[in-house]
Regions:
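N-terminal glycine-rich anion-binding loop in soluble enzyme alpha/beta folds
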Residues: 1-63, 134-168
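Conserved beta-alpha
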Residues: 94, 98-161, 240-248
Length: 250
């Protein structure tokens, strides 16, 4: 009798708090996490991009953290770029609130972005997002406050998770290539957990000659390194091959 092989996450469990309307982050993260590392998700309410909607996602932060803690993950990630980069202090506040709700180590997408940029020794960032203009500008302000120069890029004016998921990867690729031709940078950051960008990383790195990072990629990389896992999944860019100590990734 043939027995079906099921991956029960015997190496590590990563918990993630995600926007309720996001249908892209889970498949992309699962594609990047190596065998034996499981992803366990709780959703927090968010489908749009207004300031009120973004901040309302945090109203159930503690409840979501406690629910995920029941599954005993090794770490819990708050995985929303627009919320965690809303202001320079936001990621720290999110982690602090999660820490009061559960002793399980917490991280946020914003933490992963900064860790990735540091690991790649980048100072000049080309930023391409699907966001509406206010969200895009807040992310520029956050990167600037974090010590990086945003040399250029642009946004696509999309407001909802559902619309973001429908953006053709080819449209994202073409926008990146057009912006990169005008704006030299050390790294290209394709921001947002809700767009289909993971498959663009390797071909864009080949075309641009610089590292390309995405919100889902940096979260997978940062979480794995925080968990002491040094696997390098193929096809997801230079970041995974970048030497970094677990201390540096913390």
């Amino acid at each position: 009798m043939t027995q079906t092989t099921i991956d029960y996450a015997t190496r590590a469990r990563l918990g993630a708090l995600m926007p309720s309307g996001n249908t892209v982050a889970e498949p992309e993260l699962r594609a990047m996490l190596p065998a034996g590392v499981g992803l366990f998700v709780t959703r927090l309410p968010l489908t749009g991009s207004s300031e009120a909607e973004l901040l309302a996602m945090l109203e159930t932060l503690e409840t979501g953290t406690k629910l995920l803690a029941d599954a005993q993950p090794d770490a819990i990630a708050f995985h929303c770029t627009a919320v965690s980069t809303f202001a320079p202090h936001m990621a720290g506040e999110i982690r602090a609130r999660m820490g009061r709700a559960s002793p399980i180590p917490a991280l946020a997408t914003a933490d992963a972005i900064l860790a990735a940029l540091a690991a790649l020794h980048a100072t000049r960032v080309l930023l391409v997002t699907p966001y509406i203009e206010p969200v895009h500008q807040r992310e520029i302000a956050w990167l600037t406050a974090s010590g990086f120069q945003v040399t250029g890029g642009g946004c696509m004016g999309v407001a909802t998770n559902a619309e973001m998921a429908r953006i053709p990867p080819e449209a994202i690729r073409d926008r990146v290539l057009a912006e990169a031709a005008k704006n030299p940078a050390d790294v290209c950051f394709i921001s947002c957990t809700a767009i289909r960008s993971a498959g663009l990383i390797a071909p864009l790195e080949a075309a641009l000659g610089i590292p390309v990072i995405t919100s889902n990629q940096v979260l997978a990389w940062h979480a794995l390194r925080r968990l002491g896992i040094a696997d390098t999944p193929p096809g997801f860019g230079r970041l995974f091959a970048t030497p970094v100590s677990i201390k540096d990734a913390a």
